[in-house]
Amino acid sequence: MQGRKAMLVLHGKQAMNEDVRSAVGDLRDSGWVLDVRVTWEAGDAQRLVAEALAAGYSHIVAGGGDGTLRDVAEAMGLAATQASLALLPLGTANDFAKAAGIPLEPASALALLNVAPQPIDLGQAGDQLFLNMATGGFGSQVTANTSEDLKKVLGAAAYLFTGLSRFSELQAASVELQGPGFHWQGDLLALGIGNGRQAGGGQVLCPEAMVNDGLLDVAILPAPQEVVGALRDLLGGDGLFVRARLPWVEIKSSQGLDINLDGEPLQAANLRFQARPAALHLHLPAGSPLLSHPG
């Protein structure tokens, strides 16, 4: 029975979600032992992961938005566990799940526990791990400044609305990026360093990223002269980006750069990003677009 025992770490706001309750019941009826623990405050997800691993759970489910998924994935990655992770995406953007082909319907998402997990990479920024993407420049500002109320009303379109309403505030960031065989220096409008492909409610910054290639995809949108067109390009994802695929990249910015790490803001003048190959075992659908050799 141990092989069919899992713990669901569920964001507190989703505790009364009837679709989630029904999906949990269906999975239990199919023979799984699925215990549920609910987060209340910062740090709970990490604590619950530690408790689950100490208790010998071989599967953990992260239920919530991109931030919750990142918290659980980071805790498991830092623990270097062989336990596997399944994602129950319940947020507004669900960027990683959408790019990976993970169902947004709770019962279908939980059913991925029956699919063999795949080893995937995690990204590392300084001493923090991330599952999906680090964004910098205006893209991170849009994500950070999109209100929860607006998300409730507009869903993922809230990010686009925020971007359009704030385009007059666009300011380029002067940065230098360096990695193996790669160097770029100048003013950028947006930056994506992706393990996954999209962030900020559907901005596909790294369209070719794979989660099992041991590399991070770097996308730089240089600052142009015409701001409104640049915002359109950022949200539309055309070919103006400078791109690279690297095992690590270092960023330097004399004035500091705002970074958004799977929904968590941070600021740094110097930061090293690197891929952590095969750092996590994740349940993904067969043929997931994020697998370089789909399982």
Curated annotation (Swiss-Prot):
Q: What is its EC number?
A: 2.7.1.-
Binding-site residues, ATP: 39, 65-71, 92
Q: How is the cofactor bound?
A: Binds 1 Mg(2+) ion per subunit. Ca(2+) may be able to substitute.
Q: Which InterPro entries match?
A: ATP-NAD_kinase_N, Diacylglycerol/lipid_kinase, Diacylglycerol_kinase_cat_dom, Lip_kinase_YegS, Lipid_Phosphate_FormReg, NAD/diacylglycerol_kinase_sf, YegS/DAGK_C
Q: Kindly report the protein's main subcellular placement as a broad class.
A: cytoplasm
Where Mg(2+) is bound, by residue?
A: 210, 213, 215
Can you tell me which residues form the catalytic site?
Answer: 264 (proton acceptor)
Q: Please name the GO terms that the record assigns under molecular function.
A: ATP binding; lipid kinase activity; magnesium ion binding
Q: Where in the cell is it found?
A: Cytoplasm
SUPFAM superfamilies attached to this UniProt entry: NAD kinase/diacylglycerol kinase-like
Instruction: Cite a single Pfam family from the UniProt record.
Output: YegS_C
Domain (DAGKc) ranges: 1-129
Q: Where are the transmembrane segments?
A: none
Give the disulfide map: none
Q: Which UniProt keywords apply?
A: ATP-binding, Cytoplasm, Kinase, Lipid biosynthesis, Lipid metabolism, Magnesium, Metal-binding, Nucleotide-binding, Phospholipid biosynthesis, Phospholipid metabolism, Transferase
Which cofactor names does the annotation list?
Mg(2+); Ca(2+)
Q: Which SMART domains match?
A: DAGKc
Which terms under GO biological process does the entry name?
phospholipid biosynthetic process
The record, for HAMAP family, names:
YegS (MF_01377)
Family classification: Belongs to the diacylglycerol/lipid kinase family. YegS lipid kinase subfamily.
- Write out the function statement from the record: Probably phosphorylates lipids; the in vivo substrate is unknown.
Recorded protein name is Probable lipid kinase YegS-like
